[in-house]
Amino acid sequence: MTSTKDKIEKLRKILLKYEYFYHTLNQSIISDAEYDYLFRQLYELELKNKELIPSDSPTQKVGSHILQKFKKIKHFSPMLSLENTFDVNGYLNFKKRIKKSIHNNEPLSFCCELKLDGVAISIIYEEGIFVRAATRGDGFEGENITSNARMIDSIPLKLKGIDIPKRLEIRGEVFMLKSNFIKLNKKYKLNQNKYFSNPRNAAAGSLRHIDPNITAERKLIFSCHGCDFFVKTNKELTTHYQRLMKCLSWGIPVNKEIVICSSDIEIIQFYKKIAQKRNFLDFDIDGIVIKVNSLELQKKIGSTTKSPRWAIAFKFSPKERITTLNDVKFQVGRTGVITPVAYFNPVYISGVMISKASLHNKNEIERLNLHFNDTITICRSGDVIPRLLNVIEIRRCDNAKKIIFPSFCPVCNTELLENIEEKLIRCHSGLTCDAQKKQALYHFFSKKSLYVVGLGPKIINELVEKGLVKNPIDFFYLKDIDLIQLKNVGKRKSIKIINSIKKCKKTTLKCFIYALGIPGVGEVVAGKIANYFIKLDKLMNSNILELNCISGVGKIISNNIFNYFSTISNREMVVKLIKQAGIFLNDQEIHKINSEKTYFFNKKIVLTGVFKSFSRIELKTILLSLGAKISNNISRKTDFLIYGNNFGSKFFRAKDLDVKIINQEELNSLIRIKEQ
């Protein structure tokens, strides 16, 4: 048995070594036939001695079970997106902002890398062993793709080398080579299946396939572009580049096209060099990424809620195609904004078929001087968003009809009004305009508002068209018999929707403000307004001066809020929602407490798990009333983690960082003491 064990271990080490050279260093030191022969030997030995198979064996990257669905998984820290620029001025403005946030005399160098056009994922290693992987998702929560990610040959299941942290997060891109993409589509053609439109879509579909064995067949590749150590390594690393090189030493693939630049000229030269090489690479890239190299400066510069301030994507100029304009349709948005949309003969750009593009506003139509049947140039801005660049006027017919922005709403025929300051044209009919009504109602009952399970756009559209609802109040008087008459709505679904409507009555001031759909008032601004006024009646009777005092609420949004509550019909609807429909705002029950004397005053708190005594919203409301600051992410600046049943990864992260942890019993005791 000992000799068999030794033979298995020897074969495993040899194969892992070959995989490291091939996937990480891009060096083939053995033929495919030799590799396959050794692999078969190991597989047959492990098959006879299953007790000797570790999780990091090369054979464990095949033969996994089929997943039924992908569960959601929370990231240890947000997976932020990058700010984009398409020209040198954008990069120079980025550098200027960085200089402002640090001392100008501090040395500044940048780590420049390729911006791979793939799927961003996060991988967690514990004690050097691969334990989980997740997609970016919404940045805070992604899909658990652990079983599929372990099928990617270039992702090591066990790290090698020294100074490996207790827990390590690796972030990077999963992509497919162009050559493999062509082979895959040829295979699909033979089997009469649908084509993948581009390598990125093929990689995304393969990564999320319900069968991990299919993922393994698709030959996906992973490349690391960043990492985070939850516990410091023995050797302190001070730069982003050092971290990447450390990852490389542990067997994690890192793209070799990385340079450290200390001047604008060096960065622009690297950009031009990569732009020239772009079409000769066997994988898609859409630019370069420029990152402040110093980790200390990265921390000092910080991030916004969307992107790090210390990094920017310098993207290549978009690809262009010529086509014919067929029509311009004018869409009415939720807040009445009229948006022109150009429809043209379909064109294929960067692997995607495009047939329409937003023209944004009246000024854009006038700038382009658009006529029907014009020959136009289309591009994908940032290789993503369709954009009408210009008109080739020399090809215009003599009798071509000019496209005119309408003076009346295309849906309700109300006269349109232009806001010069916002550069927007609106229909001010509100809920009497069917287009606004449908979108406003969907927004009112959406996930971040007063969420009603099962109440989607199709059901709302049909309810409006049948005259069953005209405003949010009507939904609270619906009966299951009203819903049953709709398409694809049976008794069971109707009862589910009615019950959900009843439950949504209990909400917070923040959600209620957001649900009203006031122009410019998103989720974050709604939260700031709720925290400032605490009570709805104070908000309804506020003036412009008070609104301007709220951090993050500018002049335009202040005017929008003031105008909304100055409109009699809006005030009447809000009052009816509270008094007649029975909407109950938890915030109105907050006890008047001198928050400065509480245990939680000015403390940064993170919640995890399910709580017995409170819903998550109720607990947040109570803690905010006690002067606490609620955060979604654990860091060294966190004061307390409060946990309930079924807690997640935040609990372990808090332990690693020595953050004070409070259970439900301690929490109840502290809240009771402080509310007395």
Swiss-Prot record:
A biological-process GO annotation: DNA replication
Active site positions, chain numbering: 115 (n6-amp-lysine intermediate)
Molecular function GO terms recorded: DNA binding; DNA ligase (NAD+) activity; metal ion binding
Positions bound to NAD(+): 32-36, 81-82, 113, 136, 173, 291, 315
InterPro entries attached to this UniProt entry: BRCT_dom, BRCT_dom_sf, DisA/LigA_HHH, DNA_ligase, DNA_ligase_AS, DNA_ligase_CS, DNAligase_adenylation, DNAligase_N
Domain BRCT stretches: 595-676
Cofactor(s) annotated in UniProt: Mg(2+); Mn(2+)
Stored CDD domains: BRCT_DNA_ligase_like, LIGANc
EC numbers: 6.5.1.2
Annotated binding of Zn(2+), by residue: 409, 412, 427, 433
Stored Pfam families: BRCT, DNA_ligase_aden, DNA_ligase_OB, HHH_2, Nlig-Ia
UniProt keyword terms in alphabetical order: DNA damage, DNA repair, DNA replication, Ligase, Magnesium, Manganese, Metal-binding, NAD, Zinc
Catalytic activity reported: NAD(+) + (deoxyribonucleotide)n-3'-hydroxyl + 5'-phospho-(deoxyribonucleotide)m = (deoxyribonucleotide)n+m + AMP + beta-nicotinamide D-nucleotide
GO CC, alphabetical: cytosol
Enzyme class: ligase
Biological role: DNA ligase that catalyzes the formation of phosphodiester linkages between 5'-phosphoryl and 3'-hydroxyl groups in double-stranded DNA using NAD as a coenzyme and as the energy source for the reaction. It is essential for DNA replication and repair of damaged DNA.
Matching PANTHER family: CHROMOSOME TRANSMISSION FIDELITY FACTOR 18 (PTHR23389), DNA LIGASE (PTHR23389:SF9)
Family: Belongs to the NAD-dependent DNA ligase family. LigA subfamily.
UniProt protein name: DNA ligase
Natural source organism: Buchnera aphidicola subsp. Acyrthosiphon pisum (strain Tuc7)
Lineage: Bacteria, Pseudomonadati, Pseudomonadota, Gammaproteobacteria, Enterobacterales
Gene behind the chain: ligA
